[in-house]
Amino acid sequence: MANNKSAKKRIQIAERNRLINKSYKSTVRTLTKKTLENCEKYKKEPNDENKNLVTTSLNKAFSLIDKAVKKNVLHKNNGANRKSKINNFVKTTLTTK
């Protein structure tokens, strides 16, 4: 248990930041899953509309991963690995017909 005022405040700040970071990570996971789902949808029914869905969801996922790295929620290598994994999946999906 914290004994002085500054230590108590640091506990509150750490908890607040933990919740914010958790939210970022959750959103990154959600957008990644959405991108992969859109890729599967494109595989089943390749058309321009589904291709646009894949590219827009990919851009959103990349943007959020970059923001998470910028705010030190994710390590830069972790962010790069996530982007690489998503991009490889999308690339194989869009090139395979």
Curated annotation (Swiss-Prot):
Top-level taxon of the source organism: Bacteria
NCBIfam families for this protein: S20
Species annotation: Prochlorococcus marinus (strain MIT 9301)
Keywords annotated in UniProt: Ribonucleoprotein, Ribosomal protein, RNA-binding, rRNA-binding
PANTHER family registered for this protein in UniProt: 30S RIBOSOMAL PROTEIN S20, SMALL RIBOSOMAL SUBUNIT PROTEIN BS20C
Name of this protein: Small ribosomal subunit protein bS20
Cross-referenced Gene3D superfamilies: Ribosomal protein S20 (1.20.58.110)
Free-text function comment from the UniProt entry: Binds directly to 16S ribosomal RNA.
GO BP term, example: translation
InterPro entries on file: Ribosomal_bS20 (IPR002583), Ribosomal_bS20_sf (IPR036510)
Family, as annotated: Belongs to the bacterial ribosomal protein bS20 family.
Pfam families assigned: Ribosomal_S20p
GO molecular function: small ribosomal subunit rRNA binding; structural constituent of ribosome
An example Gene Ontology CC term for this record: small ribosomal subunit
